[in-house]
């Protein structure tokens, strides 16, 4: 088995390429028809297995997905592929949690995070759609982030942030939050990026923790 080059994130060995899932779970970011085409192609457990098998045979043994979404067939395919090849696949979960500032919302968030741990996730990176609700650009902070990273640590996972907004990386580094890694959009076309390519490249280069780039191809 050929091994893809590796690095270390939060004390865990990861391949320098990750398995992405937008084009297996139905998020093309281009059109509704493209989304539907993807969902039709990957509508069974068996449909996922050749993709997982190919990656794993080349040493790419980590996959990123919002496993709280429409991904039950994918999870089953992951378990079957692990059994077939005798190698574990590292789960990088990006759940969407309720970040409202009240006791009920915190209970819901904790339950979602605990579900992620029960699924076997090693990393839990809050999805950008909820994490970015906490950003205060005026103060340069991510409000109440420590509440959620503690929940993640208490559940036995490694905390991180999924970001479309590059300020999440900057503010997290500046404030020393308990965050071991980031996700950030980066590609040479600027596709779905919120600020200039050069600015994001500089932010990634100077980040204090490893950055997993998405939508690169």
Each language-model region and where it sits:
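Short, well-ordered coil/turn segments that N-cap beta-strands
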Residues: 14-17, 59-62, 83-91, 120-122, ...
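Acidic (Asp/Glu)-rich catalytic clusters
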Residues: 53-57, 75-88, 110-121, 173-176, ...
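Beta/alpha (TIM)-barrel catalytic core signal, keyed to glycine-rich beta->alpha loops juxtaposed to Asp/Glu
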Residues: 97-107, 122, 129-217
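Structural motif corresponding to the early beta-alpha repeats
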Residues: 68-69, 87-105
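Short loop/turn segments at strand-loop or loop-helix junctions that form parts
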Residues: 20-24, 94-97, 125-130
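General beta-strand structural signal in soluble alpha/beta enzymes
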Residues: 64-65, 93, 126, 160-162
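Short, acidic/polar
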Residues: 36-56, 102-117, 164-171
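N-terminal binding-site loop/beta-alpha segment at the start of enzyme catalytic domains
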Residues: 1-83
């Amino acid at each position: 088995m050929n091994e893809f080059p590796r690095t270390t994130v939060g004390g865990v060995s990861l391949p320098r390429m990750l398995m992405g899932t937008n084009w297996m779970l139905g998020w093309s970011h281009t059109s509704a028809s493209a989304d539907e085409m993807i969902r039709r192609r990957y509508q069974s457990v068996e449909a996922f297995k050749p993709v997982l098998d190919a990656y794993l045979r080349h040493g790419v043994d980590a996959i990123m997905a919002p496993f709280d979404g429409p991904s039950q067939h994918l999870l089953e395919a992951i378990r079957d592929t692990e059994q077939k090849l005798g190698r574990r696949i590292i789960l990088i979960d990006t759940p969407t949690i309720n970040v409202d500032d009240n006791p009920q919302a915190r209970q819901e968030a904790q339950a979602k995070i605990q579900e992620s741990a029960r699924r076997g996730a090693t990393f839990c990176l809050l999805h950008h759609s909820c994490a970015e609700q906490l950003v205060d650009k005026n103060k340069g902070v991510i409000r109440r982030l420590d509440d959620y990273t503690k929940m993640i640590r208490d559940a036995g996972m490694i905390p991180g942030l999924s970001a479309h907004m590059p300020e999440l990386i900057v503010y997290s580094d500046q404030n020393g939050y308990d965050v071991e890694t980031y996700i950030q959009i980066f590609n040479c076309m600027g596709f779905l990026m919120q600020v200039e390519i050069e600015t994001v490249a500089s932010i990634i280069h100077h980040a204090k923790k490893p950055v997993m780039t998405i939508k690169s191809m």
